[in-house]
Amino acid sequence: MINTSPLLNYVSSHHDIKAINQWRTDVEKQLQDSYENGQSIREIIKARSDLVDEALVFLWKHAELDQSKLGLFAVGGYGRREMLPYSDVDIMILSEDEISEENEKRISTFISSLWDVGNFKPGISVRTIQSCVEQAATDLTVATTLIEARLITGNTQLAKWPRRIVSQTWTDKTFYDAKMAEQAKRYHQHNNTESNLEPDIKNAPGGIRDINQIGWIAKRHFRVNRIYDLVHLGFISEFELAVLEEAESFLWEIRHHLHRLAKRDENRLLFDHQREIAAKFGYVRQEGQPVNYGVEQFMKRYYRTAQQVSTLNEMLLAYFSESVITPRLPNYERKIEVVNDHFKIVDNKLAVQHHKIFAEHPSAILELFYILANRPDIEGIRARTLRLLILAAKRINQSYRDNPEHQALFMSIIRSPYRLYDTLVAMKRYGVLGNYIPAFGQIMGLMQYDLFHIYTVDAHTLLLLRNLNRFREPEFAKEFPVVSSVFQRLARQDIVFIAALFHDIAKGRGGDHSELGAEDAIEFGRAHGFTERECKLIAWLIQNHLLMSLTAQKKDISDPDVVKDFAEKLGDMEHLDYLYTLTVADINATNPKLWNTWRASLMRQLYTHARDVIRTGLGRPVDYQMLIEDTKFAASELLVNNFALADVEKVWQELGDEYFIKESADEIAWHTQAILKHGDNPEPLVLLRAHRKAAQDAVQIFIYTRDQPNLFATTVAVLDRMNLDVQDAKIITASTAFSLDTYVVLDRFGTLLTDPEREETVKNALVKALSQPDQYPGLMQRRIPRQLRHFDIENTVDVTLNEALQQNMVEISTLDHPGLLARVGGLFMMQGLDIHSARIATLGERAEDIFFVTKKDGKPLNNEEVKLFSEKLKAALDEASNQICQH
C-alpha cells in the first residue's frame, strides 16, 4: 500500500483548485520516496494513475459535470493505468447525444480548470457516440484508444460503448491487418532493429509499444481487460506472461528514470542518460573493470529484454493470425506439403508433424533450420511450432553439442548457399544459436559504448556472415568486384565463415578477445570436422582479423617496405585471400559510414601490392633503383607527346627519390603537367580531380606553391571551412623550396566535383590563403554534436623515430571534433615542425591520426624535444576535450 496525502487536505473548498498543484508536487515526491524504498514500479505507475483519477473527479464535480449524463474516460496509457511522472493525461468526454449548450459551458470550465491547475498535460477529445463511430471507422488511432478507454466518472451506461464501437467498425481481420501495417511502419522508423545505439524504449522494436500491440489485438477479439486474462483462454502461457511482465517492468523503470532526468516525457535512451540510468540499476564500474563496463552491461540487459519482447510479439501475433483470422477466411483451404517425417509446410510456413517432435527427435531442432536455409520458398515458422522450438532450445546442453549428428547438421547450415544470414538470425532470435555455442550467447546484446560500433556484437557478427555470403551473388559482385572474385575462388569458404562467427566472440570477457576467440574456434573446429591445419588457419584469421585494416589505415602502403612487412606476416596467397575477404566483410558490418571508395581503394591497393610481393618471392629485397626507374619511364610515356623530356627532367631533378617511390606514374604525370603549364606564375597552383582509384566520393587536391612554415595548418583550416574531410596528405619539398602537396579529401556534401561553382570556390579559398602566409586562418567555430559530449576518451600521444625515413612518427588518439586537424596543424606550426605526410582516420567518436614530421633543418626531434613536444600536444588535446564536455 502506498500512502499519499489525500486531495481534500489541500482543497478545502471548490474555489481552491490551484492547490491541486501543490498536492500533485507533494504526492509525486511521496511516490518517488516509495519507489526508492523498494515499491515496485508497477504499483507506482498504477498509484499515480489513481491519483490523477482523484484530481479529475474533483475537477469534474467542480465544473458541475456530475449533474450531466456525460462520461469521463481515461484513454491511452492513462486508460491502462500506466502513468509515468511526465506522461500526458489523455481523456475523452463522451455523450450519448448532441451536447447541450449548458454542458458545453461546463466542459469549457472543466478544460480551463485542467490548464489552470498547470501540472496536467491534458490531451482532450469531446465526442458523441455517433462521432465516435464515424471517427473510429476511418481512424485507427481513435479505434485503438477506444479499446482501452476506462470510465473514470460520470454516466456508467456509457462504459460499454467504446469497445462496442470498435467491434462495429472493425473486423478481427481489418483491425489486425491495420495494426500490423502500423507496426511495420513503426519498425521501419527505427531501422527494424532492437539494438539502436540510442533506442526509443517506447516505440522501437522490442519496446513498450510491442507489448501494447499484443494487448490491443487480443483484447479487441477476446473482450478481456488485462493480458493476464489471456492465460485462461490459452492464448499466452504463464511463462510467456511472466517474461512479458518482467520486461515491461524493466522498460517502465527506464522510462521512469528518463522522465525524472529529462524533466519531460522522454522515451529516447540517449547517450546523455545511459550512464546515469545504468548506475541507478546498480550497473557501476568496479575497480579493474573497463571504463564503460557498467553502461555496457546495462545496455546488454536492455537489448536482450527488447529481443525477448519483439520475439514474443512476433510469435503471439502470428498465433492469433493462424488460429483466429486465417481459418475464418471464405473459401479457405490449407496448402500442406509433407517435407519428411518431422516437418510439413502449411501455408508456406514450416510446421512440425506433431507436438512431440523436438522431445522425441532432438536433432529436429537443427534440422528445422537446415530446411529453412535450403528452401528459400518457405516464408517462416508456424507459431505453434515456434512456441515448441523456443522451449526446446532451452534443452540444448553439452551432450547435445557433442552429438556428431548435430555437429554435421550445424555445419550443413553454415555451408548453405541460399539464405545463411536469415537462418542464423532466426537461430539467434529463438535461442538456438546462443545455446548451441554458449560463447555466442554471452555476446548477445553486448554493445560497445561508442559511435564506431553501431551494432551489438552478435548483430555485427551475423552481418559479417551476411556480407561474406553476398560475395557469392552477382548483384554484389558489381559493388565488390575484387573481393567477390577472391572469395569465389577460396577452396573452403566455410573456413572464413567460422572465423567470422568467432572473431569477436570473446569480447566482454577481459583479455585479448582475438586470442581467446581463437582458442574457442580451435575447440569448435576440432569437434566439427576441421583438420588441425584448417583449425590453425581459422585461429590465425581470428588472431589477425584487424591486421589488414590497421595496416591500410595507419601505415603508408605506398612504401614498399610496409607492404613487404605485411606480406611476410601472411606468408602465402591463401592467408592473404582469406584475410582480405574477412576484412572487407568486417568493415562493412561495423558501420555503414565506415566503408567508402577511398577505404576500398586502400584495401584493394594493399591486397594487390601484397599479392605481387608474395608472387615474386618474400625473400627478395626491394630494388628501389629499379622501382624508381620503372616509375619514371611509365610517367614519361604519359608526358612525351605534350612536353619535351628535357623540361620534364628539369622538374624531376628537384624531387627526391622518395617521391618516385611513393607516387604512381599517373599522379607524377598529373603533377608534372600542371607544374610545367603553371610556369613562372607566382600564384599557388591548386588542382582538383576525382581520385583515380577511389571513384567520386574521394577527391585529390594537388597544391604546388612556395614552401612556408604554416602550409599544412593553413591548408587543413581552409579545407575544414569548405566542409572537406582530409583522409591522407603527402607533402614533398623540392630543392627549389617549392612544396608539392597532395591531399585526399572526402566531401561532406558529395557535390565538389559536380558543382563547378563550388569547385572554383574551394580553389580560390586555397589560393588566397596560401598567397598570404602571414595571415593564418582562424579555426572555424562549429557546433559540437550532442553525442560527442558523453564519451570519456583518454587522449594519447605517441612519438617515435622512423629510422629509415629519419622522421618522427606522431600518433594521436583523441575525441574527434570539428576543426581537430586544423588545431593540430597549428600546433605543429607553432612548434616549428614540418609535416611530410599524414594519415587521418575517424572511427566513430574517436580520431586516430598519424603524422610524419621533422624540424626545420630536416632532422628528427631528439629525446628531450620529443618529451617536451608530447606534453604540449597532450595538453592541447586535453584542453580541447574539456571544452567539448563543457559545451
UniProtKB/Swiss-Prot annotation:
Its EC number is 2.7.7.59, 3.1.4.-. Uridylyltransferase (UTase) activity is inhibited by glutamine, while glutamine activates uridylyl-removing (UR) activity. Residues 700-782, 809-887 form the ACT domain. Residues 339-699 are annotated as: Uridylyl-removing. GO terms for biological process: regulation of nitrogen utilization. Its cofactor is Mg(2+). It catalyses: [protein-PII]-L-tyrosine + UTP = [protein-PII]-uridylyl-L-tyrosine + diphosphate; [protein-PII]-uridylyl-L-tyrosine + H2O = [protein-PII]-L-tyrosine + UMP + H(+). Keywords: Hydrolase, Magnesium, Multifunctional enzyme, Nucleotidyltransferase, Repeat, Transferase. InterPro entries: ACT-like_dom_sf, ACT_dom, HD/PDEase_dom, HD_domain, NT_sf, PII_UdlTrfase/GS_AdlTrfase, Polymerase_NTP_transf_dom, UTase/UR. Residues 1-337 are annotated as: Uridylyltransferase. CDD domains: ACT_ACR-UUR-like_2 (cd04899), ACT_UUR-like_1 (cd04900), HDc (cd00077), NT_GlnE_GlnD_like (cd05401). The keyword Nucleotidyltransferase applies. SMART domains: HDc. Residues 457-579 form the HD domain. GO terms for molecular function: [protein-PII] uridylyltransferase activity; phosphoric diester hydrolase activity. Has four distinct domains: an N-terminal nucleotidyltransferase (NT) domain responsible for UTase activity, a central HD domain that encodes UR activity, and two C-terminal ACT domains that seem to have a role in glutamine sensing. Belongs to the GlnD family. This is Bifunctional uridylyltransferase/uridylyl-removing enzyme. It comes from Acinetobacter baumannii (strain AYE).
